[in-house]
Amino acid sequence: MKIEVNLDNNRLPDKYTRHAAVEYMEHDFPVVSFPFSIKDVPAGTKEIAFALTDLDSIPVCGFEWIHWLVAGLDGHDVDVPEDSSRNNPLNWTQGYNSSAGHIYDMKDQPISQHYMGPKPPSGVHDYTLTVYALNTKLNFNDGFWYNELIHNMAGHIIEKVKIDLPVENN
């Protein structure tokens, strides 16, 4: 299985990051999700789930920041279109990102269950998109947590792939 994302000078394009135009922002965060493709999905895959996280946030806030959580994607090759987090053309479920936690306390805001784009405070952060091919359907509703996803995937992961998407605060 592989993930394909179009980068701009080896970085996630500005439109999907802290450098986005104001019309692509909500609560001072970018909200237009980037397009990408998932190819060569293994046989027997019933569902695809993915997470976009930032390990480089650990020195900043003390934990891996969750930017986007999705489950319920059909288990075959797929092109995920731009802004699919807000438009949901693939009929998936979305979990809580880190804005729903106690630091931002935005659990009641729509952004808490959608793409919350990268906003590194300094330097370059690598945002990791991890895609999971699963041999079962998880049947989540919107508003699940990352730990629930991890626990429910245990023993059901056929394949897992990652890609790092650098974003620079310049």
Could you say what each language-model-derived stretch is?
Residues M1-N170:
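N-terminus-centered regions that define maturation/targeting leaders and the start
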